UniProtKB/Swiss-Prot annotation:
Keywords from the UniProt entry: Cleavage on pair of basic residues, Disulfide bond, Ion channel impairing toxin, Nematocyst, Neurotoxin, Potassium channel impairing toxin, Secreted, Signal, Toxin, Voltage-gated potassium channel impairing toxin
Protein name (database record): U-actitoxin-Bgr3b
CC per GO annotation: extracellular region; nematocyst
Pfam families: Defensin_4
Purpose of the protein: Potently and selectively inhibits voltage-gated potassium channels Kv11/KCNH/ERG. Acts as a gating-modifier toxin that shifts the voltage-dependence of ERG activation in the positive direction and suppresses its current amplitudes elicited by strong depolarizing pulses that maximally activate the channels.
Source species of the chain: Bunodosoma granuliferum (Red warty sea anemone)
Keyword check for Secreted: yes
Gene Ontology MF annotations: ion channel inhibitor activity; potassium channel regulator activity; toxin activity
Disulfide bonds: 35-68, 37-61, 51-69
Length: 74
């Protein structure tokens, strides 16, 4: 097998694996994961500088490469 053919098959396999691993549900791509700001439980948003609007967040703290956002009374 030539090196070109091997690289082509590697790229095709990688694209197929990436498409299967991507979430199909729109809601899955828009929600965060649980996190903690000290004693307060929040939602972690990856690669965000500030909390997204429309979710009722009143506070946040920095986490590695993202934000942990929490609503009032959490």
């Amino acid at each position: 097998m030539s090196a070109r053919r091997f690289l082509f098959l590697l790229v095709v396999t990688s694209l197929i694996a990436a498409s299967l691993a991507a979430p199909k549900d729109v809601q899955m791509t828009k929600r965060g994961t649980p996190c903690w700001c000290g004693q307060t439980k929040g939602v972690y948003w990856y690669w965000m500088r500030k909390c997204p609007s429309g979710y009722g967040y009143t506070g946040n703290c920095y986490h590695f490469m993202g934000r942990c956002c929490y609503p009032a009374g959490s």
